[in-house]
Each structure stands twice: as C-alpha cells, then as structure tokens.
C-alpha cells in the first residue's frame, strides 16, 4: 500500500485496497472514506489542511475518533514525532497499535479528530524480519521515544524500530536474552538505553548503540523467580545523582533499584528497598510526573500511592489508598495538570485557594482499567478518592489505555478494546455520552442502616470534602459570622446581606418553612439578635413577602462542630455564613460565584455532619433475631415430617412473642395436613360397610382387659379428616344452637403423614392459651334442625337413647374416643362445595345465632331447602329466625334415608365420600383451574405468607420457608426469589458474626441453589499477617533465604522482635500451638493456662495485672 500518496491522486482501487487494514471512520458520514477523513462531510480537503485556532478545535470535538483493527490487538502507545504524511508537514501525533502479527502506525491530525494514514511496520524490510517472516509475532507491550519504537514480544524478544520522517519504519535491533514474556518496557533519558521487565523475574538494561545482543545490566529482586508485571525508570532520581528503577511483582511487592550500585559482574540481585503494598499480585505502576510518588494497582482491588523518596524510605505503608470495585489491570497518572483548566465548582473552590495549601497530588488525575472483562475506565482524584470523578463506559471489555498528549492540554484517553476497536474520549467535553460523572448523580443526604437496626443520616455538600480546618478555614479572630459571610463582596452587597438578616429574622411572616437546618449548641457564647430561628435559603423553600434584588449567592447551610469540638475560635453554634435567599432577578457571574464559594468555605467550621438515629424497633430485636435464626429448623430431622417442622417452628416463634408468625406456621401445618389427606382415594359405601363389619368382629373378640392397650398400640383405621379433629377441639369454647354438645377427649391417631404423635393435639393445646382461640374456626352442630332445615322431633328420642347406650359402651369400644361424623347422601356429601352458593347465608345465620363467635366457618356441604333458596331477600339481608327454619317440611324419602343412615353408622368415624360432581370437575381438563383454586390451599397460603413477610422485611421467615418448601412447591417459589432471600439472609448472618448459622443455612439449601451459593460464599481465604510492633507485612524473606534456624511468622525480620509470648512460660507462641487470649489482653499457650487455672486453681491473670478471670 502506498502511504505517502496525495489525497488528490487517489483512485478507486486505492480506496478499496486501503479498507483492508481497517475502518478509518470518525463520523457517521455516508461518503466514501479516504486516507484523510474530515469531521464533516461538507468540509473540503484544503480547508481541513489549514491550521485552526484553539476555539475552532474545541468546537469540532463532537466526533469521536474510532478505528477498527482487522486482527487481535493487545498493546497501545503514542508516538510524538513530526512526520510528513499525506502532504502534511506539521508536527503530527501518531498511534502505535500492536497485537498478534500486527503492528501499525496510525497518523492522525493535530486535532486528533481524523486519521491521515496508517502504516504497517511489519512489512518493513530489514535483516531481522527477512529470515523469520512467517513466524508468529505476538506483541505484548510497546514503548516509544521520539522516532524509536520498542516492542516486547510474548517469546521474550525485544524488537526496536526506527521511524523515518516520511513514515516508513525499519527494524534496527532484536534482543533475545529473556526466557519468558516481556511485560514492560521503558527508556532511560534517551533513545539509546532501554529497560525490559519479563515474566522470568528479571529486568535487563539494553544499550541500543551496542552491537552485542547481551544486556548491560541484569536485575533480579530475589534468588527465586518473582515475575515482574511492570517496571519504570524514575526521572526524578537523576537530580540526586542516582538512576532509580521501580518494579512491581506477583508477590505484591514494590522494589526500588539503583543502577549505579551494581556489583563486579554488572548484575543486581537484591533491591535497595522493598515494600509489600498489596496482598496479591501487583499488576501495574506509574510514576508521578512531578514528584517522587508512584501509584500501583493490584488484584486486591487497591490503588496505592506511595512516596519512594529518600526521606520516606522508612515508611512501609502507602500515603493514600483507593479502594476500587474490581482488580486493577492498568493504572496511569494524567499527562497534564488540572490547574490550568476550569473544572467544576469544587475545582474552582480549590484553585481559588493558595497553591501552597493544596496537595500537589491533587493536580493530577488517576485512571485505571480493570481485570475480568470489565468495560470501564475509572478516573479518580485524590481530593475525592472515594467517588470516581468520571467513568468511561465501553461496549466491550477494555484491553489497554493511555493518556494521550496533545497541543491543547486536553484530558484525552485512548482505549483499545478486546473487540480490536480503538476509541478516543475527551473527558473535558460535556456532551460525551459514554462518559458519566457519578458525583453529579449522588444526593447530598444519605441514609444507612447498621446491623442493630439503627441508622445514620449524612448531610454534606458534594463539593466540600475533607477540607482542612487549619489551612482553609482561616477566619480572622474576633470577626462575626456576618462579617465573614460578606467578606470578599462589595460593600453595598455586604450591607444588603446584613440588612436581610436583621429584617428577615424579626418577621414571622418571612420565616422559611424549614425552621431549623442546624443543631443548636448550648455552649454558645454568642447570642443571636432575636429569638426566632434563622431562615435558611434553599431551592424550593420560598420567603413570603420578600422582594430583594440580591444576586444568587446563597450557599448550602453547614453544621458547625459539636460541643466536644468547640474551641475559642469556633464558639458559634449555628451554620456557617448567614445565608442569603435566592432572588428571581439573580445573574451570578463566574467571578462572583468563585468568590462566594471561596469565602463560604473559609467561614464554615465543617463541611458535613452525621446524625445517628436509634430506633427501638420491636421486630428487629437482636435477641429475637439470634434465637429465631439459631432455633428455626431448616431441614427435616430423622423421624420427623414437614408438619412436625412447621409446628416446632411455630413454638419457636411463640417463645419470642412473635404471635402472628406462630399462627402462620400452624396454619401452614394444618393446610399441609389437609393437602396430604386430599391425596387419598375416597372410600365407597361398600368399602365402608365392609370395614365396619370387620371392626364389629374385632370388638367381639377383644377382651375388656386389653381394650386400653389395644387402643394405644393399634393403628387407627379411621381416615377421618384432620381438619375435623382440629375444629372439634374448640367445641368447649363456643357453641351453636340451643342444645348441648358432646365433647369426648380423643387420643392420638396415627396417619401416614404423621410421625407417631398427634400433632393436631399440640395445636389445640397451644391455641387454647393464645388470643387466637377466641376467634377459632369450627363446625357448627345443629341439634334442632337438620341439614335441610327440617325438624327432628321424632329422631330426638331415638338419638337420646342411642347416646345413653353409646355412653355405656364407651369403655368397651376401641373407637369410643372418636367423634361421630354423620354420613350424608350423595346429594349432601361434598367435601368441597365448588360453587359455594349458600356460604354467605350460612355464615349470616351463624353470626345471628352466636354473636360472641367472631369467626365461624360452616361446612360447604350444607344445603337449604328450596323455600329458603327462593327467598326474595338478598344474601346479606335479614335471615329468618331459627324457629322459622325448623318448620320447613322435609321429604319422606330424606327422612327414611337419614334413619337408615343413623342406624348403620351411629357412633362410627368414616370418611365422607366425594360427590360425583366434584370428581368430574377435578378430572375435567376443560375447566379453568384458577376458578377451582381455593384460597386455603397450602400453596396459596404459602404464597400469601411469603408476600406479607416480604412487605414486613422478615427475611428469616422468607428464607426458612423457601428452604423447606422449595422442592415441594417449585411453582410457588421461584429460583430468583430463593437465591435473593437466602443470599441476603447469609449476608446478614455474617455481618452479625453468626458464622455457624450461616454455614448451616448454606448447607441446608437445595442442590441446584447450593452450588450457586457456594461459589459466592465458599472461597479460599488468603491470610496475611502484620507485625504487631512495626505493622509491616510478615514475609520474612531474609530468614527464609538464609535457611538458618526455624522459619515461621512468629517473629519479624524488619524489627527483629517476637510477635507474642506466653504470659505463663514466656516462650514464643509458634507452630500449631493453641493460643488463648484473655480479656485483660494477655495471652498464652492453652496447656500453660490450663495448668494455671485448672490444676493450680488460680483465679487471677498469671501476668500480674490482678484481673479476676473467674
């Protein structure tokens, strides 16, 4: 390809050939692309070549520079060397991109808005690439200096290229002394000396003028191989007659070498200084442009700012640390300072102060990219290190980035994504849609909860952050607040401000709606002129009856120091400056704005305040949480069923007075029992008669002496509904009708869903002592009226005789402890009344006859006669009295059937048969299942209980119920809800240091959920120990390399002191010894303390501190 042809002489073939190497597009123009692409389709070639002033360049920054590479790319750099390409003779900026068999030089314009030409440097002819032209070349890193380009390959080779003024490249050197991948390159003060750091743990210094292929100096941090991730020459050390090189390693250490302190063979085997700044591999470093500071980033999600100068050599901890949200892959200082540019209000306030009072590290921003396919680049500033200043968002993960140099000192960042796309971002451009500013989206007021249910509210102006009281708030001694507020303004404006304060505080009409925005200090020595509170000027709180023409100079009110922080110079307890309200006719200039910000910053005593709030929330009691979380059953013990677990959880909830949760667990147990019973096949009349005959035969053959034992041991053959037994237990609390009821104590009955103990009796026993027993649900027994409202005068006498006879035979019958259930005909024997047309009438009648019973539920099988059903009265209207219902005539056939039924099944427990209509509706697939779903089904009750618990924030109930019933009701509890509840529950348990309970919850989850949770919470721990004396990381590499004595971490190589000694034997605690720490602070071996306290029976600490242990 011809790279130096003129734009006027380009042909169509040249355009097609040029597109092979990538898309040189910076605009969305539909015109054909050429070697020179202008930012606008209407701009001509001649106009694009003309030089423009600064304003025209900034006006044309609406188009982003992008380039799509045709091969896999890894490395990125910038070449600042004048090239004469495409008819341009000015100083151009060039982009160097490297990858797999890829090394291109992209020539761009001075405005960095369009690409002039691209050059393939691998096609250059030389003696080095002619013999190995077909081999794979994988360029891992690139470094440039003037016209020299150095590349580090993945096979340990360093290649050097020279660029001529016409843009042609030629390979001039090839060095292959490294054994593994080259990770970092850097030039030393000129283009003739080159540093290379490799994965093999060595740094080599190359003399590019020499014909030898061997390095001049080889540097190694230790005898064992510690891979070098990055290395850089320090330009600030030449002033002190030194040549310092810094490097970071996989061990997390930062090493400092002096190239002039080499041995006789020209090699260095130990660093001059070494600092352990990271708890994992350190992946990047970059030296400050002006000071002897270095920033390092590592996989431990930290960015460390460290002073490596001679005066700070004894320091082992970084001066600043930025906690990021991911492992840091690359970190860079900005190319230009922020002093010359006009930024936001915070930077304006900082620049208005004295330069000597500003930290010089604040002048430069820090950019970092992240590991693990993160598509962002975060820009930080040490003045606000907790919140990113800006964030660049990319569609694909970012592979590499650099700060771009330009003639306008703009903050430009060039990125290279894993989709092989080059992008340029201008951080000074406001309308950059892929650059966000998190500080602008944050609120001034924030609320945070702690683990004990208390919360704190923080109130802070977003531009006032960590301002030094001694340096910035230099208020003159003896000056008043009003004088400080008006300081820096014109005398007329100052007088207006004070006049507003005197007038506004005396008028109750002009007082702001927000009465107090500050905290009163009772120790204040200065009294306000009036007793009315000071009005606060805010956006959104107007002042009635006020009309002033002051400029918009109101600042956000600030809170002063607390009583413990009050000094002689800060005795005023009210807000900073006396605020001035907004005016509708305000036109604030930039000079006025910066002046007011500067003076208001000086006048305030503090920039933020935190208000802790303690709320004794009953539902968030610490004791209740610990008891429920530790005693709730989340899995089935041996010999227990799901119903047993629900009842035990109900008793646990009742023990902490959580009555509603207790009743929910009981309700779920009853509903679950009914669900199991409904799965049984209904019994026909013939089966019931056969079973009854077998029972009569057994009764005749059993002696009277063994009746009681048989009752306890023989399994119950009755399969009556447990719901009937449950509601029958409440007959002693309320009644229906005028007749008496027969209540017999029943014994435990086993079913196939129980564990040998009648759990319903536990419910009845516990419910009688609770407030819920007064509103219990029960079946009514009509004694003067049958199911159709027909009188039973003739049957009363027969029933009375039968009851007397049954009372005498109670001791002989093994079924005497069970309540009789009347068997209805097919027309009345429906367990589930699906239409339920008479439920409201039955309930109304029950409420009228028994006003003291709050909740009465009648069986759905009650059917009234046609005379009642055809009544013109509405459902909720007045129901005829019971005597009127009793006079209704009944058919003879019904009387005959009831008589035969009572004679056959009197005193026997049977299961009501399900009607054919219900069976047909259940087996029909044409009906709507939603219409057939009953509200008291188990899954419906479970869903309603979970929804209510979510609204109440009951994470314990949600998590416990999800773990117990997820496999049973997968259609009710989704997998997302399961993961959300359980993961949140585990997080809370870990915050409360209930680690055993958290592990129990994790192990009790379902198999598919457990594997996902284990990836989050079951991770390997990387423990790092620090010296208790000098607070340095315990590495002890010196003693490990010397291999003398017993190696361990019970001593420190830096301060040569032991970490801990036994208070009893005064020997170091090392090895696998168990160390016990006492409350007084002393510690010792477990065996020593056991001998002191247990065998010798001492009560005080053996260290002589007179602390009574027992």
Curated annotation (Swiss-Prot):
Where is the sequence biased in composition, kind Low complexity?
Answer: 38-48
Recorded hits in Gene3D superfamilies, A to Z, give: YVTN repeat-like/Quinoprotein amine dehydrogenase
User: Which stretches are tagged as biased composition: Basic and acidic residues?
Assistant: 791-813
Q: Which InterPro entries match?
A: WD40/YVTN_repeat-like_dom_sf (IPR015943), WD40_repeat_CS (IPR019775), WD40_repeat_dom_sf (IPR036322), WD40_rpt (IPR001680), WDR24 (IPR037590), WDR59_RTC1-like_RING_Znf (IPR049566), Znf_RING (IPR001841)
What's a single GO CC term here?
Answer: cytosol
Q: Where is this region: Disordered?
A: 27-57, 552-575, 692-714, 734-755, 779-819
- Sorted UniProt keywords: Metal-binding, Repeat, Vacuole, WD repeat, Zinc, Zinc-finger
> What is the recorded function of this protein according to its Swiss-Prot or TrEMBL entry?
May be involved in a process influencing telomere capping.
Query: What is this protein identified as?
Result: Restriction of telomere capping protein 1
